[in-house]
From Swiss-Prot:
Organism from which the protein derives: Renibacterium salmoninarum (strain ATCC 33209 / DSM 20767 / JCM 11484 / NBRC 15589 / NCIMB 2235)
Annotated TM spans: none
Gene3D superfamilies the record matches: ACP-like
Entry PTM: 4'-phosphopantetheine is transferred from CoA to a specific serine of apo-ACP by AcpS. This modification is essential for activity because fatty acids are bound in thioester linkage to the sulfhydryl of the prosthetic group.
Protein name listed in UniProt: Acyl carrier protein
Keywords, comma-separated and alphabetical: Cytoplasm, Fatty acid biosynthesis, Fatty acid metabolism, Lipid biosynthesis, Lipid metabolism, Phosphopantetheine, Phosphoprotein
Length: 81
């Protein structure tokens, strides 16, 4: 099971690959849409890549609840437990 720091680093890498944003810009309190300017199509790609990287399943109905990077980190951590 990955630590929250490892999950954050992994998500930052995925966001960087999808959007070109610097990994250090991906912080727990950042909103995917408002702060990081990630649209719904990019978000789905990020979710699929996160599922593969962390070995978890994030149902479509849960994706809409992942407003911030911290929300995603918490969800992935609990899904791995």
């Amino acid at each position: 099971m990955a630590s929250n720091e490892e999950i954050l680093a992994g998500l930052a890498e995925i966001v960087n690959e999808e959007t070109g944003l610097a990994p250090e810009a991906v912080e727990l309190d950042k909103s995917f849409t408002d702060d990081l300017d990630i649209d719904s199509i990019s978000m789905m790609t990020i979710v699929v890549n996160a599922e593969e990287k962390f070995g978890v399943r994030i149902p479509d109905e849960e994706v809409k609840n992942l407003k911030t990077v911290g929300d995603a980190v918490s969800y992935i951590a609990s899904a791995q437990a």
